[in-house]
Amino acid sequence: MSRTLPHLLSSDPASPFPPAEHALREPDGLLAIGGDLHPQRLLNAYAHGIFPWFSDGQPLLWWSPNPRTVFRTDAIHLSSRFRRQLRTCTWTLRADTAFAQVIAACALSPRPGQDGTWITDQMQEAYLDLHRRGYAHSVEVFDGARLVGGIYGVAIGQMFFGESMFSGASGGSKIALAALAAELHGLGWPLIDAQVENPHLMRLGAQRLQREQFLQHVATQVALPEPPGSWTQRYGERHASALAGVRLT
């Protein structure tokens, strides 16, 4: 008999999640309810292919949808027209220099079909805590001193779990995603988790993986050692125009 109710989590952040395969079919991927956003619980969730997603006024909801939406780090779609525009782009790229601003901008960005934001104050505080602990990271796009795009997520081992991205100017989020993918591909990280499919992600080259395949991939990648050094030091400051010549498809 298939499960019809999500698992209720205990108040202990060290308590395990149920297997992701126990997630409901309707709504797709809902696995558990309750608990908290303690860093130990969050890291345990991501390491097992689970993520939190809820709105203000809802209890904490934990998901592992099937299929899972991912980006191959060598397969971000940048159109020929966009690449031509990139060649003369004067924007610069950095990592982990404006994490708080990126997550705040993502929270304020309107989403088609969504009223309000799921990046609540509670969520922002939780990911700022993960950032301070060295697990949550951002790639940022600047026009001079102005932040015009960015993406943030969680890295465990050699797996990046994307959370959200934003554009403060046309193309900002696309450049941030391409910059992240190019960096991770260079490090040998094959996938970026994109969680749930939407038309925008699919136009950028996102693909679907069956949950079983995704979980196997996550188990392998999170067990690998992350490269030494901070993201800011490794990344430095780069020119967005360099992405025009990077073959990601």
UniProtKB/Swiss-Prot annotation:
Q: Which EC number(s) are documented for this chain?
A: 2.3.2.6
Subcellular localization(s) per the UniProt record: Cytoplasm
Which top-rank group of organisms is this from? Answer: Bacteria
Enzyme class, first EC level, given as a word:
transferase
This chain's function reads:
Functions in the N-end rule pathway of protein degradation where it conjugates Leu, Phe and, less efficiently, Met from aminoacyl-tRNAs to the N-termini of proteins containing an N-terminal arginine or lysine.
Biological process terms from the Gene Ontology for this record are: protein catabolic process
Q: Which organism is it from?
A: Xanthomonas campestris pv. campestris (strain ATCC 33913 / DSM 3586 / NCPPB 528 / LMG 568 / P 25)
Q: What is this protein called?
A: Leucyl/phenylalanyl-tRNA--protein transferase
Task: Please classify the protein's predominant subcellular localization into one broad category.
Answer: cytoplasm
